[in-house]
Amino acid sequence: MQILADLLNTIPAIDPAAMSRAQRHIDGLLKPVGSLGKLEALAIQLAGMPGLNGIPHVGKKAILVMCADHGVWEEGVAISPKEVTAIQAENMTRGTTGVCVLAAQAGANVHVIDVGIDTAEPIPGLINMRVARGSGNIASAPAMSRRQAEKLLLDVICYTRELAKNGVTLFGVGELGMANTTPAAAIVSTITGWDPEEVVGIGANLPTDKLANKIDVVRRAITLNQPNPQDGVDVLAKVGGFDLVGIAGVMLGAASCGLPVLLDGFLSYAAALAACQMSPAIKPYLIPSHLSAEKGARIALSHLGLEPYLNMDMRLGEGSGAALAMPIIEAACAIYNNMGELAASNIVLPGNTTSDLNS
């Protein structure tokens, strides 16, 4: 799809000059150089994002939760009934799920998006981008056609860009779908080259005696569909799912506006791997929130070159980790914008040669 290809080619590069200015500013603040550690690095990363105009700040916050069912559920890779996807999506509209509670605490709006829930009628209160009533069973067929994947990517990119126009400067991603750690593991295995046995985990409390079947399902899906690890769209279409495509679309859409995206857990790592294959330029816009407790998490993050800020033993999904990390982003912005300067207090620290001290 040419429109998608054109958009991927217009993702702006990070501004190194803005990052250098931010580094000098931070080194001149009322503290020993580097003493705020990762907060300083995060503020500098944000300063380099063109959509923030060189000044780390947070405007409106949005978490986009992609909801979809998966045909591979039929292979016995999840213990929850498939209907739980629709039930939990409805609960999200009431604000009672984990991500909704944490997002409210963080001051973020949750956008619950139906990209493939298996119900006869659309669920009231959800944003309807449904492609089909669940993806194909990747153990016996592709998850979807390439055309379906590209259209959904473009739809979500456009939705994300519209939110940015309306003042959202910080995005988070989340998902909801029974059995969705199976296609996520297939994506991670395909792109990283690691064997499914090293990547597949228990998801939502799958009994350990059923894990061998889940590993076999992932291996069969990859063998049957032969996804091209160099082609992110191909991987998503063949062994992914509509929720994973949607998450990738948020990342691409936010990056196209020069804005940050907070990853969530294992599903978001898988989507990020595919999205980075489509456009490596998006990687500096991705901020890892927490280390998922899912087995393949470290493998995926290592391949992405990302180190998460939190380790809370969480594996809920939904965008819960992204919501939990939003205050960290705001803290990085706060130190940048609100701390005093060494020079104003006539403090000179050994080894500090920043321009701030000489101004």
From Swiss-Prot:
It is an enzyme of class 2 (transferase). SUPFAM superfamilies: Nicotinate mononucleotide:5,6-dimethylbenzimidazole phosphoribosyltransferase (CobT). Pathway: Nucleoside biosynthesis; alpha-ribazole biosynthesis; alpha-ribazole from 5,6-dimethylbenzimidazole: step 1/2. The keyword Glycosyltransferase applies. GO terms for molecular function: nicotinate-nucleotide-dimethylbenzimidazole phosphoribosyltransferase activity. The active site is at 318 (proton acceptor). Its EC number is 2.4.2.21. Disulfide bonds: none annotated. Catalyzes the synthesis of alpha-ribazole-5'-phosphate from nicotinate mononucleotide (NAMN) and 5,6-dimethylbenzimidazole (DMB). HAMAP family: CobT (MF_00230). Homodimer. This is Nicotinate-nucleotide--dimethylbenzimidazole phosphoribosyltransferase. It comes from Escherichia coli O127:H6 (strain E2348/69 / EPEC).
